[in-house]
Swiss-Prot record:
<keyword id="KW-1133">Transmembrane helix</keyword>
<keyword id="KW-0633">Potassium transport</keyword>
<comment type="subunit">
    <text>The system is composed of three essential subunits: KdpA, KdpB and KdpC.</text>
</comment>
<dbReference type="Pfam" id="PF02669">
    <property type="entry name" value="KdpC"/>
</dbReference>
<keyword id="KW-0067">ATP-binding</keyword>
<dbReference type="GO" id="GO:0005524">
    <property type="term" value="F:ATP binding"/>
</dbReference>
<protein>
    <recommendedName>
        <fullName>Potassium-transporting ATPase KdpC subunit</fullName>
    </recommendedName>
</protein>
<keyword id="KW-0997">Cell inner membrane</keyword>
<dbReference type="GO" id="GO:0008556">
    <property type="term" value="F:P-type potassium transmembrane transporter activity"/>
</dbReference>
<keyword id="KW-0472">Membrane</keyword>
<keyword id="KW-1003">Cell membrane</keyword>
<keyword id="KW-0812">Transmembrane</keyword>
<dbReference type="GO" id="GO:0005886">
    <property type="term" value="C:plasma membrane"/>
</dbReference>
<keyword id="KW-0813">Transport</keyword>
<keyword id="KW-0406">Ion transport</keyword>
<comment type="function">
    <text>Part of the high-affinity ATP-driven potassium transport (or Kdp) system, which catalyzes the hydrolysis of ATP coupled with the electrogenic transport of potassium into the cytoplasm. This subunit acts as a catalytic chaperone that increases the ATP-binding affinity of the ATP-hydrolyzing subunit KdpB by the formation of a transient KdpB/KdpC/ATP ternary complex.</text>
</comment>
<comment type="similarity">
    <text>Belongs to the KdpC family.</text>
</comment>
Length: 200
């Protein structure tokens, strides 16, 4: 019986070392050598302090900042552990709402958000990414159209000209990967940090 168990135990130990230690350390080493910023989480620092990651959105609510996409992430309700409560951009619980297009809760939320945005900028159609959540709930990017839609509100709150803000948005548009993959996008955190650095 020991002769039968021994090979199985050897394989468990061998593959535990191989897949649990050697492979992760090797991949981390390769990532740090080839993509040092990405291997550390694409962290953004200002004055020696980490202010966020270029890969994870943040919940900006002040009129002085550009807002990201709605986030459907949640956290445990402190009053009832069997329930959850909204916690926008909670990276510990990344997920979409899983509500289908005919779900009344989703329809009501989108209508409410769209009406609030339309009141903010009645002359422009509301970009779809300002009322829809991403699959992860942590999307750090907006379409250039969604960022430009918010220019009047941010300009008014900061006392800046709309033209200056449009230029700032244009400077922060990231193109398609390799010229063909994905869509042009704006990283909301990078744009808001540039706003703060403008001094107004």
């Amino acid at each position: 019986m020991i002769a039968q168990i021994r090979p199985a135990l050897v394989m468990i130990v061998l593959f535990t070392i191989l897949t649990g230690l050697i492979y992760p350390l090797a991949m981390t080493g390769v990532a740090k050598a080839l993509f040092p910023a990405a291997a550390e989480g694409s962290l953004i620092t200002r004055n020696g302090q980490v202010v966020g990651s270029a890969l994870i959105g943040q919940n900006f609510t002040s009129d002085r900042y550009f807002h990201g996409r709605p986030s459907a992430t949640t956290t445990a309700d402190p009053n009832d552990a069997s329930k959850t409560i909204p916690a926008p951009y909670n990276a510990a619980n990344s997920a979409g709402s899983n509500l289908g297009p005919t779900n009344s809760a989703l329809i009501d939320r989108v209508k409410t958000d769209a009406e609030a945005l339309k009141a903010e900028n009645p002359s422009q159609p509301v970009p779809i990414d300002l009322v829809t959540t991403s699959g992860s709930g942590l999307d750090p990017h907006l379409s250039p159209e969604a960022a430009l839609f918010q220019v009047p509100r941010v300009a008014k709150a900061r006392g800046l000209s709309e033209d200056a803000l449009r230029r700032l948005v244009s400077e922060h548009v990231e193109g398609r990967l390799l010229g063909v993959l994905g869509e042009p996008r704006v990283n909301v955190l990078a744009l808001n940090l540039a706003l703060d650095e403008s001094g107004k």
